[in-house]
């Protein structure tokens, strides 16, 4: 199928990048997991590779009650603001524990934000990240930023 015309029309539409379309959807735990793995420079994990296997990832997602293809009830997975709250921070800590190794230190806050695909963060988020000098904690703070919680 030829879909480039459709894709082009979608991304050129002003509604695609309008303020009402940006950061209006809360990331699911699976989306956060993928984002954290990508930001750390990891590709898709190979089964049994590294010290953290699929069981660790499954346990983290089970604790968040968000195992793919196994919704908690017939209504499906929680969505929207139901994914936000103190449990979201705990879940993000658990997702960070799935990394096989500490993420590489970034040369700047902008480089770290680019790894997370965050390009328009608040001055508060930027200040918090700039004030932290430990690379691991800085990575964790970026993963827990309000901007990363939504997409």
What residues fall within each predicted segment?
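Flexible, low-complexity segments enriched for small/polar residues
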Residues: 2-151
């Amino acid at each position: 199928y030829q879909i480039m015309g459709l894709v082009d029309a979608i991304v050129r539409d002003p509604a695609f990048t309008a303020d009402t379309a940006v950061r209006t959807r809360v990331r699911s735990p699976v989306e956060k997991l993928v984002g954290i793995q990508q930001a750390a420079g990891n590709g898709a994990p190979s089964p049994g590779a590294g010290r953290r296997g699929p069981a660790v990832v499954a346990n983290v997602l089970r604790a968040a009650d968000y195992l793919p293809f196994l919704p908690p009830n017939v209504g499906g997975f929680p969505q929207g603001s139901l994914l936000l709250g103190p449990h979201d921070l705990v879940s993000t800590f658990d997702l960070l524990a799935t990394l096989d190794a500490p993420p590489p230190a970034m040369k700047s806050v902008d480089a770290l934000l680019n790894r997370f695909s965050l390009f328009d963060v608040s001055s508060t988020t930027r200040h918090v990240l700039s004030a932290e000098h430990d690379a691991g904690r800085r990575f964790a703070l970026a993963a827990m930023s309000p901007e990363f919680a939504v997409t």
